[in-house]
Amino acid sequence: MRSLVWAVIATLIVLTPFSEATSSIASNNEEFKQNVRVASSSLEQKGTIEDSVITRKLQSDSVKKGDSTGLEERGGLHVPTIHDNKIVQGFYKVMRYLRQKLGIDFLLTRLRYGKNGSHQPNMGYSRVDHYH
């Protein structure tokens, strides 16, 4: 009986520091989570403020330049691409005309599908050879 009491007392003595450590870790963890929440919310606010400042700057720049298009519907500026080039647009018009008149887009078909129309570009096989 006496050994059982000493075993319980020894167990309590040994386990007490662990329970204190786990409770302090848990409180530190909650404090850490709170700090992360505060930091992330302040970053989000800062980001939205910076975004709105940049958007206003871009809007004022487009108005100053007399840009008739201004901002696009989605709120972003139109970024020029190769498709805005007049020569490329002319090429597309010619290709559309040829496609309508000839029934095929012969140049792009040849580039896209290879020399004998197979769906594996430039492999040199006929369509029949592909399935064997």
Curated annotation (Swiss-Prot):
Q: Name one GO cellular component term.
A: extracellular region
* Family statement: Belongs to the RxLR effector family.
User: Residue numbers of motif RxLR-dEER?
Assistant: 56-74
What gene is this protein a product of? RXLR-C22
The stated induction of this gene product is: Expression is up-regulated in spores.
The region annotated as signal peptide is 1-21
Carbohydrate-modified residues: N116
Q: Domain note for this entry?
A: The RxLR-dEER motif acts to carry the protein into the host cell cytoplasm through binding to cell surface phosphatidylinositol-3-phosphate.
Q: Which residues lie in coiled coils?
A: none
The subcellular localization recorded is:
Secreted; Host Golgi apparatus
Please give the function described in this protein's UniProt entry.
Secreted effector that does not suppress pattern-triggered immunity (PTI) in plant host.
What residue intervals traverse the membrane?
none
Keyword annotations for this protein?
A: Glycoprotein, Host Golgi apparatus, Secreted, Signal, Virulence
What's the protein name?
Answer: Secreted RxLR effector protein RXLR-C22
